[in-house]
Amino acid sequence: MALETFVNSEPFTFGVELEIQVVNTHNYDLTKAASDLMRLIQGETFPGNITPEITESMIELSTGICHSHEQAVSELHAIRDVLVKAADQLNVGLCGGGTHAFQQWSDRQIYDAPRFQYISELYGYLAKQFTVFGQHVHIGCPDPDSALFLLHSMSRFIPHFIALSASSPFVQNVDTGFHSARLNSVFAFPLSGRAPFVLTWDSFEEYFTKMVNTGVVNSMKDFYWDIRPKPGYGTIEVRVMDTPLSVDRAAAIACYIQTLARYLLTDRPLKLSEDDYLVYTFNRFEACRFGLEGTCVNPQTGERRTIAEDILDTLDRIAPHAAALGSRAALDEIGALAKARVNDASWLRTVFKQEKSLNETVRQQCLRWRE
């Protein structure tokens, strides 16, 4: 199969995708209701899209093409409200969070769609264990070479996105010690990790053709990279975030990525080298394990600082681009999180400490989702 033609898109436009948990309102475990939700929303009018995901306990919402923070917030609220109304009719709950706190993966049912059934047959129990919930952000790129430049430039900031969105401290009734345990489920897939270090679309097409010829992949969907090109949309897709507990947090993180993209592609402050990836896995682990308190190492200078400090320094550098995009309010929210060194994982742990019940913790997640 040939690689799709890269469709040039308007630079720095963006789209947000959120995978949402569907829970019962008895004990707040995951429940099988995605098909029923999809039936109920037929005929409803809303921006963007709502689609099923790999198991019946997940559903995905996505915005249209957004230009501003204000638009993203408006669209996410509108889609969220349609889903909440349908969920109320079914007496089920919806919530964010990168993992469900106490679900048993073996109870999951694969959604009846050809691709999901194919994944289940190929990956076995990993498909059911993949009942984890992420935020993806697409960024528009003017041409394919710019997309690859942005992909590799953005890779240095992966720890920021993980730490800011982290909302998966609990797995199967256990506090994992991680801020984002969700990404540990992604690591199990053979085509996860980072994209190959190629900087021209011709070279990328050559790589893709070789992979297809091995029989390992059929399309870009088979790559579970942290950031991957989406040629049919003319975007790069940042895929490392947990689904936040509120749509407002999701919009703020998306606009941080948008603003960073404008800075990286307009100012071109970085000279890219494959050696940038020497500390990639270490920095990524630190963000997953310790959140904003984690350490990140500058691959060129060797300087070590906390992820929170690196975010605050980055916010100063990209401030002029925030002004141009109208994303100052979003970046103020990001700055407040970095200064306080708190994220949704911190909030979940605080609730559990107070309530001594993961069932009650998930119930409060559902309340947060409606705010």
From Swiss-Prot:
GO molecular function: ATP binding; glutamate-cysteine ligase activity
Keywords, alphabetical: ATP-binding, Ligase, Nucleotide-binding
Entry keyword annotation includes ATP-binding: yes
Classification via Pfam families: GCS2 (PF04107)
Key word Nucleotide-binding present: yes
Record-listed E.C. numbers: 6.3.2.2
Ranges that cross the membrane: none
Catalyzed reaction equations: L-cysteine + L-glutamate + ATP = gamma-L-glutamyl-L-cysteine + ADP + phosphate + H(+)
GO biological process, one term: modified amino acid biosynthetic process
Top-level taxon of origin: Bacteria
SUPFAM superfamilies: Glutamine synthetase/guanido kinase
Family the entry assigns: Belongs to the glutamate--cysteine ligase type 2 family. YbdK subfamily.
Free-text function comment from the UniProt entry: ATP-dependent carboxylate-amine ligase which exhibits weak glutamate--cysteine ligase activity.
Name of the featured protein: Putative glutamate--cysteine ligase 2
Organism expressing this protein natively: Burkholderia ambifaria (strain MC40-6)
Taxonomic placement: Bacteria, Pseudomonadati, Pseudomonadota, Betaproteobacteria, Burkholderiales
